[in-house]
């Protein structure tokens, strides 16, 4: 293994960034640029075809670590003596090992590699730096040991650990996102399968619904044709049963109503039955002789004349009622009633005209009373039969 070849490559890349005015350090923001210069040297060697190399030298994760360090430690001073430790803390491998493993079939960097890439003629700055480093090697080493504090060493370790933690977190996030993506893909596939199943079910249900609609339409058409036929047994049976049932129901209701009204009329008229018989016998006995004459008289006289005559008769009757008692004393003073007579008549019942007038007014009074008593019954009967 040639330490001189590695030192030449490193010094060449370092000299591209480190300026004479800045001393022997670079800033943290220059670390990705330093790595890029080293990688360009090997890419150029591969293009020339002189060597078989494993490229790229650094993985994308390592490059992300370099960029993270440059962003978080922008103005952090990286001294040349501290570079190996910082680099090892970042990628867990020394830079020398990475460069040596890049060559296929060779365990170390070939010595002619430096000559082929023109890396053995260092710049003026490199010569000056080497002379300074050679002259003051002992002084700088002793000074470094004296000035390097435990806090600085601790900060180096903390930087490496922080970067490792960040790398682990990024790996975990990547794994979680990949798992989530796989789960989403699985759910999408399941949803597609369910959607296809529902579409098939919907198509079958729609087909069944259309078949049921067609069957119902056919059934409705058959029922309508049967109903429209007046001679069909179904229509005839329904009509006859409905008509007969309704007729019987109404007839029974009317029969019950008529029977109730008859019973009520009989009860109301039965109270005056005996009085009607007595009055009828009296009227029949007294008015037998003048019955025909009075009927002819009533039919011959107009209604207006009859009203006037009635009023005059009432007045005359009132006068006669006051005079006749005195006349009766003298006319019937010596008459004694017959012992065989079964019915004793009043004095006015012996006269055909007077008895007819009295019985007429009594009949009118009885009819009015009976009409008033049966008014409610007649109204109910009229409402029932719609008269």
From Swiss-Prot:
The keyword Isomerase does not apply. The chain crosses the membrane at residues 311-327. Keywords: Coiled coil, Cytoplasm, Cytoskeleton, Membrane, Nucleus, Transmembrane, Transmembrane helix. Its main location: nucleus. Pfam families: MPS2. GO terms for biological process: protein localization to spindle pole body; spindle pole body duplication. It is found in: Nucleus membrane; Cytoplasm, Cytoskeleton, Microtubule organizing center, Spindle pole body. Residues 216-235 are annotated as: Disordered. Residues 157-269 form a coiled coil. Residues 220-230 have a biased composition (Polar residues). Component of the spindle pole body (SPB) required for insertion of the nascent SPB into the nuclear envelope and for the proper execution of spindle pole body (SPB) duplication. Interacts with BBP1, MPS3, and SPC24. Belongs to the MPS2 family. This is Monopolar spindle protein 2. It comes from Saccharomyces cerevisiae (strain RM11-1a).
């Amino acid at each position: 293994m040639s330490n001189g070849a590695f030192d030449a490559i490193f010094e060449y890349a370092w000299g591209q960034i480190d300026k004479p005015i800045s001393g022997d350090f670079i800033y943290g923001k220059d670390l990705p640029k330093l790595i890029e210069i080293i990688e360009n040297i090997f890419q150029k060697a591969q293009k020339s075809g002189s060597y078989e190399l494993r490229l790229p030298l650094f993985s994308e994760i390592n490059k992300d670590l370099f960029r993270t360090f440059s962003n978080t430690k922008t103005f952090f001073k990286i001294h040349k003596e501290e570079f190996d430790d910082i680099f090892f803390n970042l990628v867990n491998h020394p830079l020398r090992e990475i460069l040596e493993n890049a060559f296929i079939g060779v365990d170390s960097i070939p010595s002619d590699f430096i000559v082929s890439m023109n890396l053995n003629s260092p710049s003026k700055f490199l010569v000056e730096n080497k002379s300074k480093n050679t002259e003051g090697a002992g002084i700088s080493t002793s000074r470094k040991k004296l000035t390097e504090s435990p806090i600085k060493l601790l900060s180096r370790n903390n930087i490496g650990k922080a970067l490792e933690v960040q790398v682990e977190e990024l790996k975990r996030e990547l794994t979680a996102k990949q798992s989530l993506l796989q789960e989403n893909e699985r759910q999408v596939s399941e949803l597609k399968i369910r959607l296809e199943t529902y579409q098939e079910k919907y198509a079958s249900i729609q087909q069944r619904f259309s078949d049921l609609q067609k069957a119902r339409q056919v059934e409705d058409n058959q029922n309508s044709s049967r109903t429209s036929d007046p001679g069909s047994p179904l229509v005839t049976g329904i009509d006859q049963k409905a008509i007969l049932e309704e007729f019987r129901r109404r007839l029974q209701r009317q029969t019950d109503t008529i029977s109730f009204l008859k019973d009520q009329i009989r009860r109301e008229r039965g109270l005056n039955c005996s009085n009607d018989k007595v009055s009828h016998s009296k009227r029949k006995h007294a008015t037998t002789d003048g019955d025909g004459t009075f009927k002819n008289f009533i039919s011959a006289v107009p209604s207006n004349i009859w009203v006037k005559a009635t009023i005059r008769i009432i007045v005359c009757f009132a006068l006669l009622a006051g005079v006749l008692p005195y006349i009766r004393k003298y006319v019937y003073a010596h008459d004694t009633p017959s012992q065989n007579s079964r019915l004793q008549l009043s004095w006015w019942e012996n006269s055909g005209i007077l008895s007819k007038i009295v019985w007429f007014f009594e009949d009118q009074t009885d009819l009015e009373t009976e009409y008033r008593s049966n008014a409610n019954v007649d109204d109910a009967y009229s409402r029932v039969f719609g008269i």
